[in-house]
Amino acid sequence: MKEVDENSNVELFEVKLKPILGIEPKVYVFLTTIILLLSLISTLIIIPKFKNPGAYLKINSNIENTYIYLNEKYIGRTPLNKYINATEGVLRAKRMGFKTYEQRIKIHNKFFGNYSLQINLELVDPEKIIKQRQKELSIMVKIKNINENTKLIPVFSLISSELKEHPKYIKKFLKDSIPYLNSTEMFKDFLNSYKAIYSIDQDNSNQEEIWNSLKTNFDLENRAIFWFLENLDKDLKILTKNAPWVKTLAKTLDNENIQLISKNEKINIKLPGFKKINSNKIEKIQNYELNSLDSKNISLKSTYNVKEFLIQEQNVTKYEYQDFLKENPKWALNNKENLIKEQLVDENYLKNFNQIGLNEAITGISYFSAIEYANWYSKKLPTGFKARLPISQEWELYQKEPNKNPLNINEISKKVGFWNLMQNSSFNEIAIFKNEKNFYSENSNFYSLITEIRTYSQQNNNLLNASTKASFLKNWSSPNIGFRLIVSKE
């Protein structure tokens, strides 16, 4: 075979396309390319869609923001307008406190069709909704530094939307929230919901009319005007405080004394480690400044007639708490992770349990665990008696007797167990509701808790004030938190 010389000339051939029916080659090549691409798209997408076209799901519900699932996959919230490619499946609509709506749907072979559905959820557990919203509210009112990066949960707007077909629950939620409201931002949301449920013009900014409406609908005492003023934003508060109608009302309240009387019931049992405290009266005085130019404060008095009770003379010890754990394994240390998931404790629950001596006060417990301990202890008492956490007024009576070894403020860092869990969590100690004078009420679903540093009577400036308060969440399990029990008649 003859080898071709590498330097020989190679003749290049060039193919020239000719016009077809007068159409230039570059035009029909471009068109051919487009046709091929469209054919490919048709093969891969459009033709399958004719076999399984899908549809636009348009779903509305009587409750906004209902969660929609298709074949167990979350696809959005109502009002929903979303394209899906499923030909059939099980559609579910879920919302806390409502019965889950379920329906099997089938998409007919109609390309780019619509599938519209109106869902009406049935309310089955309003208390579950209320409990969750109260929990959120108690956390929201703790957030004081509001800025552009902080977005509060509009609790009142949410519950007004969720329970709009059941106004009695909304009205009760609003009223129950009053003692816990101490946030200008949340108060705005409160007023918006209040105006909506009581058919008041949202643009109505007449504070006197709003106050009188609140007072009438919620049966408030006149002294609740200070609760109202404290929740207004700074500028509006100053303006309203100086209004003639507020000054007139405040003058009638100075030195007003409301009596909160409970029928006394004699305690006829003795328990080891408990001290009997006789029935007595405790007077609380709260001062309010109406005008910064006026040196005179408005004083409100509340007199509590406290029933006879027994109180433990020391906090519950590790030894006592161990007995509780033996009979209640749910609260044992080896179940801590589950308790955290249920938000009943935090990671500090019984953290230093092994380091605590048997006769030392148990710490690292939460409000929830203390309540369960009290319920467990109640079962061991004679019929008609109940164990619970103390209320402030009971502590005051107990501490009237001076202690020989008061806790010095400089010793706090060395001491544990000086925070004592209390029964109630109200931010407001004044009696603000007419005809509702029960100050022994059980703690509600509100998740933040007011507790108090409880040492003994203040004798000089180096000692802690017995009524110093703090606010925290009920699942907190601080090494500084302890508790003791009260026993009283049921």
Curated annotation (Swiss-Prot):
Keyword Membrane listed: yes
InterPro entries referenced in this protein's UniProt entry, alphabetically: CTDL_fold, PEGA, SUMF_dom, SUMF_sf
Subcellular location: Membrane
Alphabetized Gene3D superfamilies for the sequence: paralog of FGE (formylglycine-generating enzyme)
GO cellular component: a single term: membrane
Transmembrane regions listed in the UniProt entry: 27-47
Membrane topology annotation: Single-pass membrane protein
Keywords annotated in UniProt: Membrane, Transmembrane, Transmembrane helix
Main location class: membrane
Protein name: Uncharacterized protein BB_0032
Species annotation: Borreliella burgdorferi (strain ATCC 35210 / DSM 4680 / CIP 102532 / B31)
